[in-house]
Amino acid sequence: MLTAITGINWGDEGKGRMVDLLSQDYDIVARYQGGDNAGHTVKNERGKFVLNLIPSGILRPDVVCVMGGGMVIDPEHLEKEIAALTEKGVEISPKNLKISDRATITMPFHVAQDGLEEERLSKTGAQFGSTKRGIAYSYGDKYMKKTLRMGDLVHMDASVRKRLETIVESKNLTMVNIYGQKPVSVDEMWAWCERYAKLFAPYICDVGQFLAEADDAGKKIMFEAQLGALRDIDFGIYPYTSSSNTVSAYAPIGAGIPGRKLALSIGIMKAYSSCVGEGPFTTELAMTEADKDALREHGHEYGAATGRPRRVGPFDAVASRYGVQCQGCDELALTLLDVLDYMEEVPVVTAYKLTDGTTTNRFPTGKTLDDAQPVVEMLPGWHCDISGVRKFEDLPAAARNYVTRLEELVGCKIKYISVGPERDACIVRD
């Protein structure tokens, strides 16, 4: 059985928290895209964990985690992430962590170029709000066939050295002539690769074969997405997107088994909206600065990977309905409902008003989205602590009505409702 856990919005919806909860019923959890540019935060009895590269299932001792070929992997960051997990008592070995030999390596020059380009663009206000982790440049070089893959670390021979020389020669045309930097050293990059070859070679394998055999044997496999539908390179708010496909249809492809079909798609969405980075974010126009500050503080809305304050706003039903459609959701998980406990009234964006005076509940693109204004519906708040509730019928009537109203607006059943950061702070509806 293949299940995808994906984000409905801009990312930061709480996917890691839900993967950690639901993975107790799965054998394998696989990441299929992205790099270390976003963090999945999980809290359990052992403390707080922020996972950037490793699937959230790693916190379950009986789960095997897979880093798929659709990912871009910075070995330096992966080493630190493994060390941080190990320090907290999480056991990691090639038995429970497998890295695709097809995954792209994020090299030091990718990270450097990302920072330099964002700095250059910021001088004219044209920056994208990059995390400066080298993600776009890793994917760009992947498609231009000018980088190495994790499988190359297993065979560090003369042919790999020759390819690296060609890659560095090409990269130096940019680093020296555009950014005025010192040339990248082939010897330094080779030594860097050798270091991580020794460290990660035992983890690197053909994960496609592993996943196919597991699926054939009836194992339950969960695909864990990074970011959300609105950050998808094709279906997101271009160019303010990530550089990979975050949608569920890509999950089997990026994980390593492109011929297999999903049995279940579970979308994760917040009870309100948040966003890191540049680009149109219509829902934030529906709140005063003071109200946004209050929501940000109650929700602790700061990027898990960057620490940057997130932009916030009411639940955006227009964007969420589009995200549900993009992800082909069978059911939804609504996270952070408890964050709204303090509100007397809870705003919801139900439509967008366009410059021609019309309103729409369809998510627009381009200039139409840039100029859209939110249409807001106010719902009664419940103004009490719901963090201890474990049954839907025990929620205050206003909270139940809020959940059912969101279901109506996005057109999909909400099965899971998280009411706190702890592993068991979740309501499961029949």
Residue spans for each PLM region:
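Non-transmembrane, aqueous-exposed alpha-helical and coiled segments at domain scale
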Residues: 1-430
